[in-house]
A protein has these predicted regions:
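Extracytoplasmic beta-rich repeat domains
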Residues: 266, 285-300, 308-317, 330-344, ...
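Aromatic sugar-binding surface patches on proteins
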Residues: 203-214
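Blade/loop signatures of beta-propeller domains
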Residues: 252-282
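Short, compositionally biased P/S/T/A/G/V-rich stretches that sit at domain boundaries
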Residues: 139-171, 175
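Extended active-site neighborhood of metal-dependent phosphoesterases/phosphodiesterases
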Residues: 1-59, 78-93, 101-144
């Protein structure tokens, strides 16, 4: 709309105000769908005059539709009215939107802060959230993302079901949009009588509270009850209750093959595992102390490896290795910013790329940094793609910042020149048959020669420009979902072999799983979908609960969302959902045969090895189930 209409409804498009000792400046975007009633000269003259009238040294925070610069110096320029260096006026932060992403970084002495939509999923599948900034008298601030639509949500993730006796892990996810949690207390009862009363849990993240429940041998075989009370800063209370039974025998994870990439391998083909005995028992859970987003857990030589996000730039971004036997943290390696998508292992090195475009190579045994690179990606949007590794090479980045490196040395082998970066893209690179398949959100799906980096093909029709999901490679074919269709492509050429339109939105980060009879994938609003692999007709749908946090672009309530990729063991497929539950589903009829609720959304895919199933939640908890 025109600025005249905007101003007639909302008031001026550029203005300033003081709050405390800080001067806040609201500036307009330079243009839009219609020519605005102001010019860059008008705004620059006004801005110069405005800042000339504040006390020297006053902290300044500027709001605008978009980021002014990728550089460390913030210079507001005009056509004929000169320019003004905002760094000379004690600029503390530049707060912007436009990209529909959650991304915070430091540019020199200035923080740039972007927040996605508070009522719907972001363009890059960012969480629905609003940002609270706590600013002190010096203009220094802390940031806090608050996730919308949650009203005193509480769930006991552990203990639940059948547990091994001894000291039990207590994990509670609790969240409310309007108020942080002040404290969480638990009471354990046997036959209605307290065994332990009003014990305090420790806060691990904005979602999760954790502790331990010591139980003597006399409670073995008895059904016990855990009651939890959470008190919020605004005085509200939430309560939950869980029944569980202690047994003397411990469930011991016995790992087999490594799970080194998304869906187990670089082709993301999710090979079938041996059946898991149901019901699965929680062998252990541990919280890493930071939120876990789309970085699906890996299993490598007895270790579980995950990586965290740092949406508020408080130093929370790390890669972690946990002992697969008991969940203890073996090492953590700090990174500069959020790691938002798939990590991978090759040559006993784990690779991760952060939102600022840094690629990290970390020794899986020691957690020591082997090497790192600044990828030549654009300053915006944030790098949230998943990487892939295989046969001694790691592939990372996106657009003309997509590169191949020797895994052990970091030597660059090639850099993509054939296609450019898109919007924030949640798909993970797929590797196989000397082909690297990548995507750029709102642009296309691309095939590059894995040895040379040469662009071989691009496809964008019929919704393939929406690049949320990653393709699975089976033989000479690619299987993927996009927008409102399921596709089979010829991998070598990108030729569409099959396109099946679907009556629902599948713009999710879910790689299709091929079983012996089904093709199974997540959806934005209908839960898990299975097509008959011969006829491609819908075989079943398995509904799940409403997403605790919305992530699919422009999705709102109600949305039974699955942003993850399913895996299979025997006749059961396992999948994690945005409703905070991991499900075991009979692949023949779509019926739920096992589930475990955590109370925090699950954006990372399940990992399988031997008798163990590993999954993580957004609250920072990692869970290992086995039987």
């Amino acid at each position: 709309c025109s600025s005249d209409l905007f101003e007639s409804i909302y008031g001026p498009v550029y203005y300033s105000f003081d709050a405390g000792n800080v001067h806040y400046v609201v500036t307009p975007m330079p243009g839009g769908d219609h020519a605005p009633g102001y010019t860059s000269d008008d705004v620059c003259r006004w801005l110069k005059n405005d800042l000339a009238h504040i006390r020297p040294g006053t902290p300044v925070v500027v709001f605008n539709h978009d980021l002014l610069t990728y550089e460390d110096t913030f210079i507001f320029k005009s056509k004929n009215a000169g320019s003004i260096n905002l760094n000379e006026y004690n600029l503390k932060a530049w707060v912007y939107g436009h990209w529909h992403i959650n991304y915070m970084k430091k540019q020199g002495d200035v923080y740039s802060v972007c927040t996605s939509s508070l009522d719907k999923g972001g363009i890059d599948h960012s969480t629905t959230a609003f940002r609270v900034m706590h600013v002190d008298s010096k203009g220094d601030f802390t940031s806090e993302l608050r996730y919308t639509y949650l009203d005193k949500n509480i769930c006991i993730a552990s203990p639940a079901g059948v547990m091994a006796s001894g000291v039990l892990p207590v994990a509670v996810n609790v969240y409310s949009s309007v108020s942080p949690v002040r404290e969480v207390l638990y009471t354990c009862l046997a036959d209605g009588k307290p065994v332990l009363k009003n014990k305090r849990l420790l806060q691990s993240t904005d979602w999760s509270w954790n502790g331990e429940l010591p139980l003597s041998h006399k409670y073995v075989g008895k059904e016990l009850t855990l009651r939890v009370t959470a008190r919020f800063n605004n005085g509200e209370i939430a309560e939950a209750e869980s029944n569980f039974i202690c047994r003397t025998e411990k469930t011991v994870p016995l790992f087999s093959a490594d799970w080194d990439n998304l869906s187990g391998n670089a082709k993301h083909s999710a090979p079938v595992s041996a059946p898991l005995n149901l019901p699965l028992q929680l062998a252990w859970t541990n919280n890493v102390g930071a939120n876990l987003y789309m970085t699906s857990p890996l299993i490598h030589k007895g270790k579980v490896i995950v990586a965290s996000v740092d949406e508020d730039l408080k130093g929370a971004g790390h890669v972690y290795a946990l002992n697969g036997k008991d969940g203890t943290i073996l090492w953590s390696c700090p990174v500069r910013n959020s790691i938002k998508n798939s990590i991978a292992v090759d040559s006993d090195i784990v690779f991760a790329q952060d939102a600022q475009g840094f690629l990290y190579a970390i020794d899986t045994e020691t957690g020591k940094l082997c090497w790192e690179k600044q990828l030549p990606v654009n300053g915006l949007p944030a790098l949230i793609d998943g990487l892939v590794a295989g046969e001694g090479v790691v592939y990372a980045g996106t657009g003309k910042g997509l590169c191949a490196f020797e895994a052990r040395t970091g030597k660059q082998l090639w850099k993509n020149e054939g296609w450019g970066q898109g919007e924030g893209t949640t798909s993970t690179l797929t590797l196989g048959n000397n082909l690297l398949v990548a995507g750029a959100q709102w642009n296309a799906l691309y095939g590059n020669d894995a040895k040379t980096g040469e662009k071989l093909w691009a496809v964008s029709d019929n919704g393939l420009r929406n690049r949320g999901a990653s393709p699975a490679m089976h033989g000479a074919l690619l299987y993927l979902i996009s927008d409102k269709s399921f596709f089979i492509l010829e991998a070598a050429t990108g030729k569409v072999i099959v396109r099946k339109p679907l009556p629902y939105n599948v713009d999710v980060t879910s790689t299709p799983l091929l079983t012996d009879k089904e093709i199974i994938f997540g959806s934005a609003q209908k839960g898990l979908i299975a097509l008959d692999s011969e006829t491609l007709e819908e075989k079943w749908t398995c509904p799940v609960g409403d997403a605790l946090v919305y992530t699919c672009p422009y999705s709102r309530q109600p949305s039974a969302t699955i942003e993850t990729s399913a895996v299979w063991a025997g006749d059961i497929v396992y999948v994690a959902a945005s409703d905070g539950t991991v499900y075991g589903i009979n692949k023949e009829d779509g019926k739920v045969v096992w589930k475990h609720a955590t109370g925090a959304p699950m954006f990372g895919s399940v990992a399988l090895s031997g008798n163990a199933l590993v999954v993580s939640d957004f609250g920072g908890n990692v869970y290992l189930f086995c039987k």
